[in-house]
Curated annotation (Swiss-Prot):
This is Small ribosomal subunit protein uS14. One of its GO terms (cellular component) is small ribosomal subunit. Signal peptide: none annotated. Pfam families: Ribosomal_S14 (PF00253). InterPro entries: Ribosomal_uS14, Ribosomal_uS14_bac/plastid, Ribosomal_uS14_CS. Part of the 30S ribosomal subunit. Contacts proteins S3 and S10.
Length: 101
């Protein structure tokens, strides 16, 4: 199980990404628009650099909802491979059955 501080840190990052998403998107739009003057695009790039680091979506790391494990993460289920196997073997995931042929 991951430390609670790491899980809380990821939650905090996710909130910050949502908070700054619109501002970050508008600044990125300005910096990539070739029709605008270079000076205006450069100022937008500087403003983008002034935003908090944790407001970037690339800083978020997917973690298991039950254990907080960061590796072997299944996006559709939001679980790690270990919890997926455990819950599936107990029949707690609807529609998932052990394969046999």
């Amino acid at each position: 199980m991951a430390k609670k501080s790491m899980i809380e840190r990821e939650i905090k990052r996710a909130k910050m990404v949502q908070q700054y998403a619109a501002k970050r998107a508008s600044l990125k739009e300005i910096t990539t628009n070739a029709d605008l003057p270079m000076e205006q695009r450069f100022k937008a790039q500087l403003k983008l650099a002034e935003l908090p680091r944790n407001s970037s979506a690339t800083r978020i790391h997917n973690r298991c909802q039950l254990t907080g494990r960061p590796h072997a993460y299944y996006r559709k289920l939001k679980l790690s491979r270990i919890m997926l196997r455990e819950l599936a073997s107990f029949g707690q995931i609807p529609g998932m059955v052990k394969s046999s042929w």
